[in-house]
UniProtKB/Swiss-Prot annotation:
Stored InterPro entries: 3-IsopropMal_deHydase_lsu, Acnase/IPM_dHydase_lsu_aba_1/3, Acoase/IPM_deHydtase_lsu_aba, Aconitase_4Fe-4S_BS, Aconitase_4Fe-4S_dom, IPM_dehydratase_rel_enz, IPMI_cat
Name of the protein: 3-isopropylmalate dehydratase large subunit
A Pfam family this chain is assigned to: Aconitase
Positions contributing to [4Fe-4S] cluster binding: 350, 410, 413
The protein's assembly and partners: Heterodimer of LeuC and LeuD.
Needed co-factor(s): [4Fe-4S] cluster
Taxonomic superkingdom: Bacteria
Pathway: Amino-acid biosynthesis; L-leucine biosynthesis; L-leucine from 3-methyl-2-oxobutanoate: step 2/4
Catalytic activity: (2R,3S)-3-isopropylmalate = (2S)-2-isopropylmalate
Enzyme nomenclature, EC number: 4.2.1.33
Family from the record: Belongs to the aconitase/IPM isomerase family. LeuC type 1 subfamily.
Cofactor note: Binds 1 [4Fe-4S] cluster per subunit.
PROSITE patterns: ACONITASE_1, ACONITASE_2
Organism encoding this protein: Rhizobium rhizogenes (strain K84 / ATCC BAA-868)
Length: 469
């Protein structure tokens, strides 16, 4: 009888083509997502060696990082480098027979949002993309992670990837979330607990009552930020919530094929007694709405907390690093988080740009007005999310409140398009990274949930969504 296995072990074993004595392994890849930034050199490499894309039907390309999100984006991209990358993806997709969603296609959107909504992402699969937040797809019980440009070429050519197996970590979130606390708060709390290096060398499986209670959108938010916790990937075992989400998607199996798939997907659970190399447990009931204060996703406190004092940190290097973060962020120790005023609000990204996120925002801002000191924008994660939001009348609520309602794309999550912060501007953002310059040169980013960002836009400063009226 074989030893009990984790979910990660099972998916790994199912895709193992070959293994060497030094631990180097060759994995079969089921799905490959491609965007305009990390793919041009990969396609050029194929061209130079006379190779083809081995499995174009398992490859899906979309523009997201560089595309403008303004209503006039049909007029083209101003930045020459960005324009060349977008044009190259269109050319490469056509030449190599890969399905491609252009900016004018309503299916276009952020790569990690379009995969699931098209049914391209399915449980038990290995999924890669030249983008670190590929971990998002792990919400379906698939092994998904980012790869480098040379690896993009390798997968295009061979449909395989050279890897070494990571260790297993379990993060269990027990109990029920209080009102006003969301999946975004869970993952920020986890990163605050383990640190940005806490998951290094691991694949994290998320489990527990609070995780099971999440929608697929919430689970994607959790897995999306696994990389910010240092992990290679994040996984959540599939269940009825997963199966219901998948049904009816354009590329999902149907009929008898779906029944057979679900029978297999139900086996994608960690066996009782399986070994984890590390276990972390959080109590959901104790979690507050969370705000980041520094320039690392581990720099987090409760919205009712204060900016911490780095002098209380024992480690000298870490103490110096946190003082630098405070200097960059323009904050002083002891400042209550609710007294921090903001200039900008960005709601969107592959972390929080889905319909559930937009509904949460609408609930907060309906009948209210964005503060006169705040410039706030909402960027749907895909054309289909935008279409759904408008069908529900959410866009009217946003516009009436004074939000800028945009076209789909990565937008202000990263300073690679026209949406960016000016030096010194402070932003409440639903994205995943608050590094120096991430949203624009000398821009200051605070990571929060969609509801918290929405409330901050109205108040002009951070507020506790649990007390919001």
């Amino acid at each position: 009888m074989s030893a009990p296995r984790t979910l990660y072990d099972k998916i790994w074993d199912d895709h193992l083509v070959d293994s060497q004595d030094d631990g180097t392994c060759l994995l079969y890849i089921d799905r490959h997502l491609v965007h305009e930034v990390t793919s041009p050199q990969a396609f050029e490499g194929l061209r130079m060696t006379g190779r083809k894309v081995r499995a174009p039907e398992k490859t899906l390309a979309v523009v997201d990082h560089n595309v403008p999100t303004s209503p006039d984006r049909h007029l083209g991209i101003k930045n020459e480098e960005s324009r060349i990358q977008v044009e190259a993806l269109a050319t490469n997709a056509a030449e190599f027979g890969v399905q491609y969603y252009s900016a004018s296609d309503k299916r276009q959107g952020i790569v990690h949002i379009i995969g699931p909504e098209q049914g391209f992402t399915l449980p038990g699969m290995t999924i890669v993309c030249g983008d670190s937040h590929t971990s998002t797809h792990g919400a379906f019980g698939s092994l998904a992670h980012g790869i480098g440009t040379s690896e993009v070429e390798h997968v295009l050519a061979t449909q395989t990837l050279i890897q070494k197996k990571a260790k297993n970590m379990l993060v269990r979130v027990d109990g029920q979330l209080p009102a006003g606390v969301t999946a975004k708060d869970i993952i920020l709390a986890i990163i605050g607990e383990i640190g940005t290096a806490g998951g290094t060398g691991y694949v994290i499986e998320y489990a527990g009552e609070a995780i099971r209670a999440l929608s697929m959108e919430g689970r994607m938010t959790i897995c999306n930020m696994s990389i910010e916790g240092g992990a290679r990937a994040g996984l959540i075992a599939p269940d009825e919530t997963t199966f219901e989400y998948i049904k009816g998607k354009p590329r999902s199996p149907t009929g008898e094929a779906l029944e057979q798939a679900i029978a297999y997907w139900k086996t994608l659970q960690t066996d009782e007694g399986a070994h984890y190399d590390r276990v972390v447990v959080l109590d959901a009931a104790a979690l507050p709405p969370i705000v980041s204060w520094g320039s690392s996703p581990e720099d987090v406190v409760s919205v009712q907390g204060i900016v911490p004092n780095p002098d209380e940190i024992q480690d000298e290097n870490k103490r110096t690093s946190k003082w630098r973060a405070l200097d960059y962020m323009g904050l002083k120790p002891g400042t209550p988080m609710t007294e921090i005023n903001i200039d900008r609000v960005f709601i969107g990204s592959c972390t929080n740009g889905r319909i559930e996120d937009l509904r949460a925002v609408a609930k907060v801002v309906e009948g209210k007005t964005v503060a006169s000191t705040v410039d706030a924008m909402i960027v749907p994660g895909s054309g289909l999310v935008k279409e759904q939001a408008e069908a529900e009348g959410l866009d009217k609520i946003f516009k009436a409140a004074g939000f800028d309602w945009r076209e789909p794309g990565c937008s202000m999550c990263l300073a690679m398009n026209d949406d960016r912060l000016k030096p010194g501007e402070r932003c409440a953002s639903t994205s995943n990274r608050n590094f120096e310059g991430r949203q624009g040169f000398k821009g200051r980013t605070h990571l929060v949930s969609p509801a918290m960002a929405a409330a901050a836009a109205i108040a002009g400063h951070f507020v506790d969504i649990r007390e919001w009226n």
